[in-house]
Amino acid sequence: MDASKSSKKRKAVTRDVEEEAGVFSGDELQVDVLDGALSDNANDLSSDEDVSDSEIELVDDFSDEEDGDEEEELDSDEIPSDGGESFKKASGTGNARDESSSDEEQLNYRIEKDANGNDRYVYDEINPDDNSDYSDVEENANTIGNIPLSFYDQYPHIGYDINGKKIMRPATGEALDALLDSIEIPKGWTGLTDPSTGKPLELSQDELELLRKVQMNEIPEEGYNPYEPTVEWFSSKQEIMPLSAAPEPKRRFVPSKHEAKRVMKIVKAIREGRILPYKPPTEEEDKEQDVVNYDLWADETERPDHPMHIPAPKLPPPGYEESYHPPPEYLPDKKERKAWEEADPEDREREYLPNDFGSLRKVPGYESFVKEKFERCLDLYLAPRVRRSKLNIDPESLLPKLPSPEELKPFPTACATVFRGHKGRVRTLAVDPSGLWLATGGDDGTARVWELLTGRQLWSVKLSEEDPVNVVRWRPGKDAVILAAAAGDDIFLAVPPIADPKIEKTSLEIIDAGWGYAASKPPPSAAEENKKNVPPQWIRPSLSLAESGVCAVIPLRYVVKSLSWHRRGDYFVTVCPGSSTPASVAISIHTLSKHLTQFPFRRRIKGGGPPQTAHFHPSKPILFVANQRTIRAYDLSRQLLVKIIQPGARWISSFDIHPTSSTASGGDNLIVGSYDRRLLWHDLELSQRPYKTLRYHRKAIRSVRFHPSGRYPLFADASDDGSLQIFHGSVTGDMLSNASIVPLKVLKGHKITGELGVLDVDWHPREAWCVSAGADGTCRLWM
């Protein structure tokens, strides 16, 4: 019975170790400790004081966290008195077992005798490891707390340990011992005395290692990596495009000339002796530099005022409310006093409230006196004062006197006809020279011809399936009916079947005359065709387009946005403003009679960005080319740059030349529309800058146009705000008088679609009528 109990007890506090296990659970287990425990203390488990610390460590090393959960907690009262004898027998038999066996049972308790002589099981205290939050006080630690050791100077001990025993004062060596200790310095020696123990203070190995790392500028913490990859919390998203693709400037790689000049100045000054090395001043020089005290009242003569002296303005005289005994009507009542006190100091009408003191001797000091004087001094010191002579001028007299719009009629005032049929935006329109037909082009890729007065559609052709028709223009002259339309990167020349057969036949002959000239030229070689600046060859249209009236196609390979005819009808210029268009092929001039295309510019126009539009002068061999910010005039006969016009706009959208521009009519006049909502009038005889700048639109201006005949001095502009504005602009031949500009009418009727309003405008050649094309898919005739 006793043997079974003791065996159960051993199972509760120990665990078996497999024979193949080569590694114990405790890292601190040592072989010499294990041998000593088995050889010396195996038969002496019942003694009280013979159990060594090595056995305790051995039991702790063999114990495991998992086994600790399964162990049963045993108290000394639960163990019977005869359990000790059975345990002794079991322990005696255990010594006879094989020492190499891994089934050794280690005990974590010892047997002592209680007061009645019975066996008492005393369990060892648990030693927490480094990961535990609990730590026991060392047995020899001084536990007196924060009390100074000077209190124990008259006692042989210096404190008490955890068990209440006295800690005796360590013996002090003689001077010879101190000398020997200083010669043979032990590891961790500091030369200091530990105040808690009275012994020499020695540093541990960990403290020495910490000091070594600090001295060597190393990181004290183990496993810390100071070069971990940076975590970009706010800029971790990779940017594909650079913030600035500008090339590095040359000044980054060339020595600074500015600094070289400054250095040479200093070198020259040193050579000339103007810059001397520093020398400490002598006592005589210090005496010469002493501060001299001047008598402030030595010269009391009055000095004349400065010529620019302006006397300070006088203070206003005091009123009745500032009197110490004001009339009763100036005294505030309770409501007014409360409102004044609750108001903000900046919102008060006055800085004080009138009071009635009865007599002058009862008047106290004014609390805001110093503040008011200080603010007045600040005003006199900081605020500039200027003498001004007042001019009595009527503002109305400064404005120019404009004639009444009723005196400048006729001009369009109302919508007469609406043209509907396009799907999507109507990008362009043009009225033919006879004034009978209207040609339009839109996003649906079709070019249509309408009867102007009735709005009836007469002819339509599908020029492109994907690309919109960007521009349509009639050939000048009434002898032929030829329509030029640009869709995508092709230009189409068509003869709509709307005129009488004689005019239609003449139109076909004009276009067909160029095929013979083109056939006489040798075809370009394969190497020339691969070049980008090779002029394109005019080709015949497809069968479906030929049946619709298209006679010739010019493949430019780049999108055309502008087309303008010469006044004689044999030349027209086109502009491809795309950013991907090479500079040498952006502007092209086409000859109708020869079926010839030429690129007059070899390089991109300097300054102002890519070209936007171009027009021929109505009476001179001059070509005007506009890029984003400037307009350049080229003399085609002399092949020279004549003039550079600077409108000052951010982005030029369109421009037009006055039809009567010549030296006889007072010089050339232009109007320029820009995407920054400005309409600019240029008189080239006055300046390259704008003569007038008109800002009447809320959005970008898309198109501007003069009336083609000199009969009506009218011009109009079209804007994305859905409105057209009609102006009167008269130009006289007198060089001493300037052009007069009068706003006449604002025409509204188009709906804003997709942030776009009116895209194009054109005038009737003989009447004061205009036609507009809108993004809402309609065209309107204004009369």
UniProtKB/Swiss-Prot annotation:
Q: Which UniProt keywords apply?
A: Nucleus, Repeat, Ribosome biogenesis, rRNA processing, WD repeat
> Where is this chain compositionally biased, Basic residues type?
1-12
**Per its record, what are the GO molecular function terms?**
large ribosomal subunit rRNA binding; ribonucleoprotein complex binding
Its GO CC terms are:
nucleoplasm; PeBoW complex; preribosome, large subunit precursor
- Any signal peptide, and if so, which residues? none
Q: Which residues form a coiled coil?
A: none
Q: Where are the WD repeats?
A: 421-460, 464-504, 555-600, 606-644, 647-692, 696-737, 753-783
- Protein family per UniProt: Belongs to the WD repeat BOP1/ERB1 family.
* Protein name, per record: Ribosome biogenesis protein erb1
Q: Lineage from the top down? A: Eukaryota, Fungi, Dikarya, Ascomycota, Pezizomycotina
Name of the coding gene: erb1
